[in-house]
Swiss-Prot record:
Source organism: Mus musculus (Mouse)
Superkingdom, natural source: Eukaryota
Residue segments, region Disordered: 150-206
Tissues expressed in: Widely expressed.
Name of the gene: Ate1
Reactions accelerated catalytically: an N-terminal L-alpha-aminoacyl-[protein] + L-arginyl-tRNA(Arg) = an N-terminal L-arginyl-L-aminoacyl-[protein] + tRNA(Arg) + H(+)
Name of protein: Arginyl-tRNA--protein transferase 1
Length: 516
């Protein structure tokens, strides 16, 4: 079993107060309001806890809408993949893809009739404008001081832990690699032991009962589906596989991995490649992927040719603060940021940008070649991502949710995310999950709602002990209680308290808040 080194602490730079910019949904010039911070590096657990408090990332910029003030409140939404059953419209999209692959048939009619076809992504124009204006004070020279401070701090922890007989301790990685100019650090090499075989010969005995034969066919089908999904998780090409016949209703996997004739018109492969730090597969396909993004932005979002630049693409969809982590009990591909590439006949036609976190797969963005919009790639990719989450759950049981970003009830085009049931919305005041069916009546009456029906309920994860918050100041990591004793400006505490309440007690004690 390969050893695993825990990542260094997250390092963030919080921008005090609220920021107003043009809304990407209703186009209100100053209607969108949010809090924000720049994440120089972030652990996947910290980001998991942040999105469970209403935060979301755009590149390395992490923001949280001011829900009771912003023009279009954005509620975090998650789907339950393990209980998910495709609807009739979902099955229609999957069958349309199969017909196209098998016979080259192109569905007639207006592709815009599909509710998700060109609206699978969140609006980000306002974020880009904001990021360009950010005053980021934590530079590389300052960040290089973090390594020594963390190493010193963790050595003390290591001594203490060893005394207690613990087998694990933290090994800080090079802070220059993680937090530098945006150039990738070297991928972490993890030895993966040989995969278990498929067991004994599965040949059918001479005499077997019908029930036993059905069970055997079902077992073979599950093995085929697991094999295909496992290949996808490791970045290997995945083709549609033959399926075992069954009288049972078709599952999501049945519909996705349905058999194709040997002379099929097209071949679809799905590959998952790590985008940060960039894997060799990601580097090799970067230009082709960017060209798909550029065309998508120009055709679907009507961007001028000079707007979707390589720099913008990299900053928004390739750069990520998330550390690559490979714990023994995690998914084979590890945690972090990835691109799920859809290859049709040897060329990329769509890319889903994903974060794989301890408890979920989080969808960041989708872009595709507009020439293939008739395939309803927004719906198709969401269904593939749900199936991908189910596959990851097989090895990592706590990874059982599919986060679809934000649900925006006040914007009709963005209500499509509520079609993936069962799903929950995050209460913006108490940060508990509430079934979407219970939330919709309230949202029909008011665009901002508290979903938790208990009037006495409070935010249990709120900051309770400000002095335990961690800061990074003058080459040292320290508790806020120590830091404030050396500060002459008492007004600074208001901004620190605002940050602490927004990120919650757990994150405030783990993440390092940079102080200039």
């Amino acid at each position: 079993m390969a050893s695993w080194s825990a990542p260094s602490p997250s390092l963030v730079e919080y921008f005090e107060g609220q920021t107003s910019f043009q809304c990407g949904y209703c186009k209100n010039k100053l209607g969108s309001r949010s809090y924000g911070m720049w994440a120089h590096s972030m652990t996947v657990q910290d980001y998991q806890d942040l999105i469970d408090r209403g935060w979301r990332r755009s590149g390395k910029y992490v923001y949280k809408p001011v829900m009771d003030q912003t023009c279009c409140p954005q509620y975090t939404i998650r789907c339950h993949p393990l209980q998910f059953q495709p609807s009739k419209s979902h099955k229609k999209v999957l069958k349309k893809m199969l017909k196209f692959l098998a016979k080259g048939e192109i569905s007639k009619g207006n592709c815009e009739d599909e509710p998700m076809d060109s609206t699978v992504e969140d609006a980000v124009d306002g974020d880009f404008a904001l990021i360009n204006k950010l005053d980021i004070k934590c530079d590389l020279k300052t960040l290089s001081d973090l390594k020594g401070s963390i190493e010193s701090e963790e050595k003390e922890k290591e001594k203490s832990i060893k005394k207690e007989g613990s087998k694990e301790f933290i090994h800080p990685q090079s802070i220059e690699e993680k937090l530098g100019s945006g150039e990738p650090s070297h991928p972490i090499k993890v030895h993966i032991g040989p995969k278990p075989g498929k067991g004994a010969d599965l040949s059918k005995p001479p005499c077997r009962k019908a029930r036993e034969m059905r069970k055997e066919r079902q077992r073979l089908k599950r093995m085929q589906q697991a094999s295909a999904a496992a290949s996808e998780a490791q970045g290997q090409p995945v083709c549609l596989l033959p399926k075992a016949k069954s009288n049972q209703p078709k599952s999501l996997e049945d519909l996705i991995f349905q058999s194709l004739p040997e002379n099929a018109s097209h071949k679809l492969e799905v590959r998952v490649v790590r985008s940060s730090p960039p894997s060799p597969q990601f580097r090799a396909t970067f230009q082709e992927s960017y060209q798909v993004y550029k065309r998508y932005q120009m055709v679907v979002h009507k961007d001028p040719p000079d707007k979707p630049t390589v720099s913008q693409f990299t900053r928004f969809l390739c750069s990520s603060p998330l550390e690559a982590e490979h714990p023994a009990d995690g998914p084979e591909c590890g945690y972090g940021s990835f691109h799920q590439q859809y290859w049709l006949d040897g060329k990329i036609i769509a890319v889903g940008v994903l974060d794989i976190l301890p408890y979920c797969v989080s969808s960041v963005y989708l872009y595709y070649d507009p020439d293939y919009s008739f395939l309803s790639l927004g719906v198709y990719s969401a269904l593939r991502e749900i199936a991908f989450t189910r596959q990851l759950h097989e090895k990592t049981s706590q990874l059982s949710y599919y986060y679809m970003g934000f649900y925006i009830h006040s914007c009709p085009k963005m209500r499509y995310k509520g079609q993936y049931r069962p799903s929950d919305l995050l209460c913006p005041e108490t940060y508990v999950w509430v079934p979407i069916e219970q939330c919709l009546p309230s949202l029909d009456n008011s665009k901002y709602c508290r979903f938790n029906q208990d009037p006495e309920a409070e935010d249990e994860g709120r900051s309770k002990e400000l002095d335990r918050l961690r800061v990074f100041h003058r080459r040292s990591a320290m508790p806020y209680g120590v830091y404030k004793n050396h500060q002459e400006d008492p007004s600074e505490e208001a901004g620190v308290l605002e940050y602490a309440n927004l990120v919650g007690q757990k994150c405030s004690e783990r993440m390092l808040l940079f102080r200039h």
